[in-house]
């Protein structure tokens, strides 16, 4: 079973749970989208093991389990996000934030909710919403 070597806890509720459709996430995770649970920087703690990190872009680094290879986390300057599939109870973490990177959304992946949609994270509208959440 994947991700047995890394365990983490958070001292707070997540800032949001969102879905990313960008090409980077598609390629890194091998899926049309990635669902992540985002926490303000400093609230996520690794209590067993720790991910191995690499710089994936100018604005983020990503971490994975060096034992099983599972993607675990990505980190921006102000937040850390873990992937819902790494959680013990993923069914309890329904997206409530937004859809990101919709310019790269694969056409057959149909969005069935009314969450806000943003083209990219450098979109001024996204930055404004992000700063208020």
Feature names for model-found ranges:
Residues 2-133:
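A short Gly-Trp-Pro
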């Amino acid at each position: 079973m994947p991700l047995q070597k890394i365990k983490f806890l958070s001292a707070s509720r997540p800032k949001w749970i969102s879905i990313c459709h960008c090409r980077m996430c598609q390629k890194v995770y091998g899926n049309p989208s990635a669902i992540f649970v985002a926490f303000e920087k400093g609230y996520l703690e690794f209590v067993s093991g720790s991910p191995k990190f690499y710089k994936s872009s100018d604005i983020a680094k990503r971490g994975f389990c060096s034992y099983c290879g599972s993607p675990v986390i990505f980190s921006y300057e102000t937040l850390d996000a873990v992937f819902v599939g790494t959680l013990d109870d993923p069914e309890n973490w329904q997206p409530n934030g937004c859809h990101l990177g919709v310019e790269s959304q694969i056409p057959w992946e149909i969005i069935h909710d009314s969450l806000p949609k943003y083209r990219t994270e450098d979109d001024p509208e996204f930055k404004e919403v992000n700063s208020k959440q």
